[in-house]
């Protein structure tokens, strides 16, 4: 991409050469179309970039005069469209004129490439990959226009605007810290009884505390600190302040106050400032003892309260990743005999956590992950309790069995799943071509990995989990959501292609099924995080990362629903019972999600956007000719509705037998059996070596969407009743604290 300056330069102005010639640095005869474009078969895309400062000189052949630029955003939008048109013309052959199905060898040839999205909003340039929910929404013209002025959206809610104004980003990244001393830091420490309670709150609330801090060792060092505070390493003091700051955060979440107290907020910020001062005073870039642990807890302090995605937190993770690699966390400690067994095991725990943080935050901001697993060989930590070993151990004990539900068991299970998820994101963000066979291999690997999760961490119905801790239930939900998010990203590229090519029906079914299940989790989490719910004590764990998963799900379902409405408008919609049921499930899921997003629209910018997206999509669905939900479950409310939804979810064949999903490597009998159950075509019927290249990423037929949406008037959302008559909606107004 080239940035065109408005100042005069010595070379010829860019507007006298076509876009193709400019990009390829070729000669141009300035005709319309130019001979270069004609020779390359790009006559229809031969375009001249307009210049506001200079008049366009006419060539021998007349060409249309360019319209004046209406602003930098219009020019960028125009340039993006021209570049995408050029890419499509170069990389893809025209579709065959006949209606015959394409052969398996060219299945991917007509799939559009995905560049992602570059936006300039609020004087900020931002890029997200094609997998990000913002890129998906960009394909719907009326939604793109609706959110084009991000300033208006940011100021739509005074409460949200106020919250945004208060947050200035992680102070560690911006410096400007006043000089401080050890004495002033120690003077800010609360009294011993208060500190004891906050430390206890941290270890009893942070269920993954063991992956960062070894509890018994910390308590022993904690006692030593009170005997001689002035002799304690400054970085350990920073670790202590991070622990009491997180304990303060957990304590405040349990008070359930509706309006935040400035005094409580200032106390938490004061503790956070002390963490930063200790990091700076201890020169954290030298990565001395306790530096990685303190940085990881500092990230938690910035991440947990965030209602929306914060790119600063992703930058923080980048710092942690590079510092960890600087001291060799990515290489297994067994290569270095000087590292003691206790230190080696804690390094493995730290690295497993860091790898997950990297993939989690990178996906959230729509960028490739930073850790390259090809240069890493750190093995997973052993399934041990903190009480099983200490810093004096000579040989580590063997791992506990998978039946022992430890936090490290969950860490390892999620790490295995995230490894496959990382392979999927690498595939979809790569610029190298791939094949549909590779996609299906990853699909099988993903299902096999989920099937290998220990039984204690497999998803269970809530009615079967009422005697278990909330953290165990949440861990199962998190693992299942990661699985379905991976399915969405892996198969999303083929979502719309399946509407015209039955060869991709398995991908469409997988993608829609996964998105619906993610929204079912959103509904369960919203209900059970209310006071008195099974998960109320863990509602602080519903972070912006989960909201990103919910946003991804609603955009996928919205696009598929819009495709059904488009076919219905042309009388081309196939009304099979399964398709009708799937569409009703989509509408039902989007309606419930819409009401959940409304609860936090005043405190979250992303929630406000999600609610607006669903307003538009559901309004169009209500006015279309497609059938609306009609199910006995819609007449239920409260616990009955949750129970019915859960029963429908848990009894689905795909959930009970995920590892037997259609796979080209499986036997024909198994593939046919499962695919028949799912009513989808088996990929084994058409999975041959695909020689045609497919550009990476996931995208949709934007031209099709644009032509459909731009010809319609956006309804007045403020005066329209978007609720379907057969659906039940919560009326108690709970959830205003934005726990989801």
Swiss-Prot record:
Locations listed in the record: Nucleus
Annotated region (Disordered), positions in chain: 625-645
GO CC entries: nucleus
DNA-binding segment(s): 25-46
InterPro entries documented for this protein: Sec_Metabolite_Reg, Transcription_factor_dom_fun, Zn2-C6_fun-type_DNA-bd_sf, Zn2Cys6_DnaBD
GO biological process entries: DNA-templated transcription
One Pfam family named in its UniProt record: Zn_clus
Single GO MF descriptor: zinc ion binding
Keywords per UniProt: DNA-binding, Metal-binding, Nucleus, Transcription, Transcription regulation, Zinc
Its job: Transcription factor; part of the gene cluster that mediates the biosynthesis of macrophasetins, 3-decalinoyltetramic acids (DTAs) which feature a tetramate (pyrrolidine-2,4-dione) unit connected to a decalin fragment and that have potent bioactivities.
Name of the protein: Zn(2)-C6 fungal-type transcription factor mpsB
Species this chain originates from: Macrophomina phaseolina (strain MS6) (Charcoal rot fungus)
């Amino acid at each position: 991409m080239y940035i065109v300056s408005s100042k005069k330069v010595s070379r010829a102005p860019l507007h006298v050469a076509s876009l193709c010639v400019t990009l390829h640095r070729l000669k141009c005869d300035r005709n319309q179309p130019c001979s270069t474009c004609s020779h390359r078969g790009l006559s229809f895309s031969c375009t001249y970039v307009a210049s506001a400062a200079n008049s366009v000189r006419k060539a021998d052949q007349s060409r249309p005069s360019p319209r004046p630029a209406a602003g930098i955003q219009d020019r960028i939008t125009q340039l993006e469209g021209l570049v995408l048109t050029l890419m499509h013309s170069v990389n893809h052959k025209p579709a065959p004129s006949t209606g015959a199905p394409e052969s398996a060898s060219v299945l991917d040839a007509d799939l559009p490439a995905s560049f992602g999205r570059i936006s300039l909003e609020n004087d900020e340039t931002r890029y997200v990959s094609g997998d990000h929910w913002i890129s998906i929404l960009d394909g719907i013209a009326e939604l793109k226009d609706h959110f084009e002025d991000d300033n208006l959206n940011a100021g739509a809610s005074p409460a949200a605007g106020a919250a945004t104004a208060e947050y200035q980003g992680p102070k560690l990244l911006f410096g400007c810290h006043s000089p401080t001393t050890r004495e002033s830091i120690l003077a800010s420490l609360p009294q011993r009884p208060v500190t004891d309670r906050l430390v206890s709150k941290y270890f009893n609330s942070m269920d993954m505390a063991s992956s960062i801090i070894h509890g018994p060792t910390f308590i022993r060092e904690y006692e030593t600190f009170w005997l001689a505070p002035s002799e304690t390493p400054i970085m350990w003091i920073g670790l202590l302040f991070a622990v009491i700051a997180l304990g303060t955060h957990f304590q405040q979440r349990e008070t359930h106050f509706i309006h935040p107290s400035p005094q409580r907020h200032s106390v938490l910020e004061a503790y956070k400032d002390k963490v930063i001062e200790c990091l700076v005073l201890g020169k954290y870039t030298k990565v001395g003892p306790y530096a990685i642990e303190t940085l990881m807890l500092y990230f938690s302090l910035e991440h947990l309260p965030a209602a929306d995605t914060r790119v600063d937190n992703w930058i923080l993770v980048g710092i942690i990743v590079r510092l960890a690699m600087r001291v060799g966390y990515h290489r297994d400690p067994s290569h270095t005999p000087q590292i003691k067994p206790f230190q080696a095991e804690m390094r493995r725990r730290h690295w497993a956590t860091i790898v997950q943080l990297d993939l989690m935050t990178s996906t959230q901001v729509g960028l490739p992950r930073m850790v390259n697993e090809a240069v890493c060989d750190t093995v997973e930590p052993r399934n041990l309790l903190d009480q099983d070993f200490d810093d004096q151990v000579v040989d580590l004990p063997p791992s506990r069995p998978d039946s022992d539900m430890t936090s490290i068991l969950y860490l390892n299970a999620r790490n295995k799943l995230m490894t496959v998820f990382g392979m999927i994101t690498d595939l979809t963000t790569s610029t190298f071509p791939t094949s549909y066979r590779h996609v299906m291999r990853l699909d099988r690997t993903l299902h096999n990995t989920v099937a290998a999760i220990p039984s204690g961490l497999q998803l269970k119905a809530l009615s079967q989990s009422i005697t278990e801790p909330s953290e165990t239930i949440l861990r199962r939900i998190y693992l299942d959501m990661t699985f379905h998010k991976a399915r969405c990203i892996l198969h999303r590229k083929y979502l719309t292609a399946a509407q015209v090519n039955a060869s991709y029906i398995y991908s469409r079914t997988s993608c829609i099924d996964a998105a619906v299940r993610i929204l079912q989790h959103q509904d369960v989490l919203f209900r059970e995080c209310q006071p008195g719910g099974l998960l109320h004590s863990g509602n602080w764990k519903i972070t912006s990362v989960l909201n990103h998963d919910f946003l991804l799900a609603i955009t996928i379902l919205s696009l598929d629903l819009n495709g059904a409405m488009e076919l219905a408008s042309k009388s081309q919609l196939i009304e099979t019972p399964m398709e009708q049921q799937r569409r009703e499930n989509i509408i039902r899921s989007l309606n419930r999600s819409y009401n959940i997003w409304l609860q936090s629209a005043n405190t979250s910018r992303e929630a406000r956007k999600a609610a607006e997206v669903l307003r538009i999509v559901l309004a169009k669905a209500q006015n279309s000719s497609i059938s609306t939900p009609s199910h006995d479950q819609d007449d239920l409310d409260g616990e009955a509705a949750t129970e019915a939804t859960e029963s429908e979810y848990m009894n689905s064949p795909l959930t009970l037998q995920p590892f037997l999903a259609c796979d080209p490597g499986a036997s024909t009998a198994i593939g046919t059996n499962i695919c028949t159950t799912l009513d989808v075509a088996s990929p084994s019927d058409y999975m041959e070596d695909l020689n045609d290249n497919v550009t990476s990423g996931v995208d949709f037929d934007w031209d099709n969407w644009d032509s459909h949406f731009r010809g319609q008037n956006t309804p007045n959302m403020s005066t329209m009743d978007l609720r379907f008559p057969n659906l039940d909606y919560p009326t108690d107004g709970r959830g205003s604290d934005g726990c989801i």
